[in-house]
Design a protein with these regions (language model features):
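Active-site microenvironment for binding and transforming phosphate-containing groups
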Residues: 1-266
């Protein structure tokens, strides 16, 4: 099933047909922030006011059907750290100081997970058998460290999930067209994944372009996840719709990838 765009009360987000719990990859549309954060900025610490971010999170919760007070967020450092969380980790959506990690997993009903992006690759995970969910943020370093696969591993080890049951969605990121790097990035991918990854690397002059969505999908396939939906949106190409760190030279807000755990059968 394809990734689809939805708009509820002016809040625009992308959803995956295979994930049946509340979830979405947000866009810039539907919030109250202004300037470079206009308008649905979800991240603190980027020059926006706390009041704006809180209202944006309220609006997102209303659109997707989750309680913002039961959010758990990430403090992202391009690591491979995956945190297992419960309702005890919900600190309220006004709280800015969460422990360092780049992925979250839970099987606690009504807990909502949120990771932030603005070119990096967002991934969401859902197991309809156990009800467990996950969310991951993968920059090129996280991709090389296989954070998507490690998120799956955390779901398997902590919640008894089977990879073949897990449904995953890969959201908008900076595409092959604009993710230009020096040689260190493809070398990191080759060290992590071997020769198979070369098909997702293009040399253009003295620079390299990489397809990070495809590399992350390959990584998930290797650990047994085959139900993967992939957005074709590039944050750089569509920087009027998504925040792109590169296109905006760092003057930006952040969109989010969000998913809520629900009791199995409800």
């Amino acid at each position: 099933m394809p990734i689809e765009t939805k708009r509820i009360n002016q809040v625009e987000f992308l959803t995956a047909g295979g994930i049946s719990v509340p979830h979405g990859f947000t866009t810039r549309y539907g919030g109250v922030s202004t300037g470079t954060q206009a308008s649905l900025n979800l991240a603190y610490g980027r020059g926006d006011t706390m009041e704006n971010v809180v209202e944006n999170l309220r609006r997102l919760g209303s659109a997707l059907g989750f309680d913002p007070e039961k959010l758990v967020m990430t403090r992202q450092t391009h690591s491979d750290i995956v945190r297992v969380v419960t309702d005890r980790d919900c600190r309220g959506f006004c709280h800015k100081d969460y422990p360092e990690c780049d992925a979250l997993v839970t099987n606690t009903p009504e807990v909502t997970l949120l990771v932030f992006t603005a070119d990096c690759t967002p991934m969401l995970f859902f197991d309809p058998v156990t009800g467990a969910v996950g969310a991951a943020h993968a920059g090129w370093r996280g991709t090389a460290q296989k954070i998507g696969a490690k998120t799956v591993k955390a779901m398997v080890e902590n919640f008894g999930c089977k990879p073949e049951n897990i449904r995953s969605a890969i959201g908008p990121n900076i595409g092959l067209c604009h993710f230009e790097t020096d040689e260190d990035v493809p070398q990191a991918m080759l060290a992590a994944y071997g020769e198979e990854v070369r098909q997702f690397i293009e040399k253009r002059g003295d620079k390299y372009h990489l397809d990070l969505k495809a590399i992350n999908a390959m990584s998930l396939n290797r650990v047994g996840v085959t139900q993967i939906e992939i957005s074709d949106a590039c944050t750089y190409c569509q920087c009027d719709r998504f925040w792109s760190h590169r296109a905006s030279h760092g003057e930006r807000g952040s969109q989010g990838a969000v998913i809520t755990c629900k009791e199995v059968g409800r």
